[in-house]
């Protein structure tokens, strides 16, 4: 999978094709994070073939649809449980992110894993994504934003305008 652009959350439901022996096969549902519905269906078959004796040729997709965030204007803390294949083996990992949406947090996770661990998107498997209460957060990088009286420094910006005179009679004001 190529994690291009912002990933979207899909709900994919699939099953084995009905047969004489099994006329009503059980349905399997998955939350898949993918750039589009084609990749989402492909990832569903990849994961379901690892878990059950099912494959695309002997099964069907019953439903594949986007899942929308309930409250996309509220900042939330997300805990992501994942496993990834590195050059030395397979590792389990728990990570925390702050974002507005679940898909935004997962996209952030894919970017972070690529930057910190050189893990490609195809080598990462998201197992669970959950909204976490502020008191349950473990990572100090996330906990630092839980202060209600948080203050950010004003930037010391030096404006370099090309069409202004280079030498002038007054000093520039760089504090805003």
UniProtKB/Swiss-Prot annotation:
One of its GO terms (cellular component) is cytosolic large ribosomal subunit. It holds the Pfam family Ribosomal_L18A. It comes from the Eukaryota. Gene3D superfamilies: 3.10.20.10. The keyword Ribosomal protein applies. It is found in: Cytoplasm. InterPro entries: Ribosomal_eL20 (IPR028877), Ribosomal_eL20_dom (IPR023573), Ribosomal_eL20_eukaryotes (IPR021138). GO terms for molecular function: structural constituent of ribosome. The keyword Disulfide bond does not apply. GO terms for biological process: cytoplasmic translation. Keywords: Cytoplasm, Ribonucleoprotein, Ribosomal protein. Component of the large ribosomal subunit. The ribosome is a large ribonucleoprotein complex responsible for the synthesis of proteins in the cell. Belongs to the eukaryotic ribosomal protein eL20 family. Component of the large ribosomal subunit. This is Large ribosomal subunit protein eL20. The gene is rpl18a.
